[in-house]
């Protein structure tokens, strides 16, 4: 049997993989209440169909820190901060594409249910701020839809309440 990592006992679960299908995270428990991790995701093209914006696609990766009020591997209230780098691609009704990239910061509060089979369900919500700048554009017409794409990204730069749901397995 391998020796425990960083002072853990043999029965402690230090790692967890969590997913919401389009978002995945791998975390390491620093102690009973604190965890750090890496997350990544890709949200496939989402139909917007508003103000000449047809679809929005996002991809991102970054780091997270979690604090559980009782413990990471038990039923507990929690706060998680996410810092990530990402990109967004907007497609307008004329087929033009506009690519944006930058960073984002989110703080989520919620509750985690931890089951005896090492499965956890995490539910929460919190604000999201992102700062993405236009990197490139592939214009198909002269109808000026780039302005509509910029306005859509501006609307998404601060979202006051973003839902958060993950299912995880600790090991």
Describe the residue ranges of each PLM region:
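Primarily recognizes Gram-negative and organellar outer-membrane beta-barrels
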Residues: 12-16, 41-49, 82, 92-93, ...
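Short, surface-exposed charged micro-motifs
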Residues: 25
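Predominantly the C-terminal beta-signal and adjacent terminal strand-loop region
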Residues: 116-171
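Residues that define the transmembrane beta-barrel architecture of outer-membrane proteins
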Residues: 13-15, 20-22, 55-61, 99-105, ...
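A membrane-pore/channel beta-structure motif
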Residues: 8-10, 21, 29
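Cleavable N-terminal export/targeting peptides
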Residues: 1-12
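Gram-negative (and chloroplast) outer-membrane scaffold detector with strong preference
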Residues: 28-123, 131, 167-171
């Amino acid at each position: 049997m391998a020796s425990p990592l960083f002072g853990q006992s043999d029965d402690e679960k230090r790692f967890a993989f969590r997913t919401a299908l389009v978002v995945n995270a791998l975390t390491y428990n620093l102690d009973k209440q604190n965890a750090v991790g890496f997350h990544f995701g890709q949200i496939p093209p989402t139909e917007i169909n508003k103000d000449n914006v047809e679809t929005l696609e996002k991809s991102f990766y970054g780091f997270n820190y979690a604090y559980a009020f009782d413990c990471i591997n038990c039923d507990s209230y929690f706060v998680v901060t996410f810092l990530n780098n990402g990109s967004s691609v907007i497609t307008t009704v004329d087929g033009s594409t506009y690519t944006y990239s930058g960073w984002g910061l989110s703080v989520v509060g919620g509750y985690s249910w931890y089951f005896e089979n090492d499965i956890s369900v995490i539910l929460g919500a919190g604000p999201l701020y992102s700062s993405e700048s236009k990197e490139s554009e592939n214009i198909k017409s002269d109808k000026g839809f780039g302005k509509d794409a910029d306005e859509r990204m501006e609307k998404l730069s601060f979202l006051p309440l973003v839902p958060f749901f993950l299912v995880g397995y600790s090991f």
